[in-house]
Regions:
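Surface-exposed amphipathic alpha-helical segments
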Residues: 161-187, 207, 213, 324-355
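Short, well-ordered beta-strand elements
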Residues: 149-158, 242-247, 323-332
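C-terminal motif of bacterial Sec signal peptides marking the signal peptidase cleavage site
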Residues: 16-19
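Signature of long, low-cysteine stretches enriched in small and polar/charged residues
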Residues: 93-102, 106-154, 268-322
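Bacterial N-terminal signal peptides that target proteins for export
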Residues: 1-8
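C-terminal, beta-strand-rich globular interaction domains
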Residues: 230-234, 249, 253-355
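Secretory pathway targeting signatures of secreted, lumenal, and periplasmic proteins
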Residues: 30-37, 45, 50-58, 62, ...
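Start-of-domain marker
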Residues: 25-147
């Protein structure tokens, strides 16, 4: 009996070690987007792609084509899809619409239209002074009234300067809303745990893949790795989602748009049995995961399986490792929009880190 305390101490030590080990080895979450929302505030209304726009009649008559061309820009996939849906709104509806996710105000600090008067009352005097000094500013406010919200205010000294400011800043305004949209998608995606990072030890890169994906292909000889999300119930209401990585040695950076198209075509044929619809292909310079490279968008088809869908591929060259990468995102979703799925996959693919 005199050894009982010692035995108990040893058992407690073993249990503590085992507990710590299990805690260390248990799946983890990727928390980069956890602070996106303010959970102390009410729930937000509206769709992620709807932007409620408030502006005076004179400004609308002048800027409506620019607003629509910027925010409702399209991308050609299986068919053209819009990023956003613009809803021009009356400022008198603000009490109701203040609970919605995306609000865009366009006004001045000198004109007398209702939207400008609203902004003049709402804007801090110091910010009004900035507008007077610069003749135009863009302000953003996150989660002002509800837990998930982006408010963008485009404010000029007068209508003439306001029109110039919006026209010159149209891409920036679009990017503000797009950034918020993609982060919302990422937040939802990463509410679950991710595949353990030990999985990627044999590879020259790592990814934060949600653990509801499964391994689709692991072709080590051809340096190709692919993951697939597929819903348990196959009723057409849930998309198939693919994330794939291909890499190859490349001593000098000769990566270009042709390399991207040729490599993606080869991967589709060898790994998926697919081909690309050349009429839909679009390439552009694009920054991905901190690298300047290229993006390829379009549609894929598989006649044998009577299947098809949309894809986006990202290519870049890593100088340190002297390797070229192609990161591919692909979806099969006959009954739904492909663009939001590809935006979600982009956020997952963007977690790629080259070792």
């Amino acid at each position: 009996m005199k050894h009982l305390p010692r035995i108990i101490l040893i058992l407690l030590t073993v249990l503590l070690f085992t507990s710590c080990r299990k805690s260390h080895e248990s799946p983890t979450r990727y928390t980069a987007f956890d602070d996106l929302f303010d959970h102390s505030k009410p729930i937000a209304f509206g769709e992620d792609e709807d932007i409620y726009v408030f502006c005076g009649q004179q400004i609308r008559s002048e800027l409506e084509p620019v607003i629509l061309a910027s925010l409702e820009r399209e991308v050609a996939l299986v068919y053209n899809e819009k990023y956003f849906n613009v809803i021009f709104s009356d400022i008198n509806e603000m009490e109701r619409l203040m609970r919605f996710k995306n609000l865009l105000f366009i006004g001045t600090i000198e004109e007398g239209d209702p939207v400008s008067r609203y902004l003049q009352k709402a804007l801090d005097p110091k910010l009004q002074a900035r507008v007077k000094q610069s003749t135009g500013e863009i302000f953003q406010n996150k989660n002002r009234f509800v837990k998930d919200q982006l408010i963008v205010q485009v404010i000029g000294l007068d209508n003439e300067r306001l029109a110039d400011l919006f026209t010159l800043s149209a891409n920036r305004i679009f990017d503000l809303f797009l950034d918020r949209y993609t982060k919302r998608l990422a937040y939802q995606t990463y509410q679950m745990q991710i595949i353990e990072q030990d999985f990627f030890e044999p590879y020259p890169f790592s990814l934060k893949i949600p653990n509801n994906y499964r391994l689709y292909a692991n072709d080590k000889n051809n340096r190709f790795l692919s993951f697939l999300y597929r819903a348990r119930i196959q009723n057409g209401k849930h998309p198939d989602k693919f994330i794939s990585v291909y890499y190859e040695p490349m001593e000098q950076n000769v990566l270009d748009e042709k390399w991207l198209i040729d490599t993606r075509t080869h991967i589709g044929k060898v790994q998926f049995g697919d081909s690309l619809n050349v009429e839909t292909l679009r390439t552009e310079s694009f920054k991905f995961a901190g690298y300047q490279g290229f993006r390829l968008s379009g549609a894929w088809i598989n006649p044998e399986k009577f299947a098809g869908g949309a894809f986006q591929s990202y290519a870049f060259w890593d100088e340190k490792t002297r390797q070229a990468y192609l990161v591919d995102t692909m979806t099969f979703f006959p009954e739904g929009g492909k663009l939001p799925v590809l935006m979600e996959l982009f956020m997952v693919a963007s977690t790629l880190k080259v070792k």
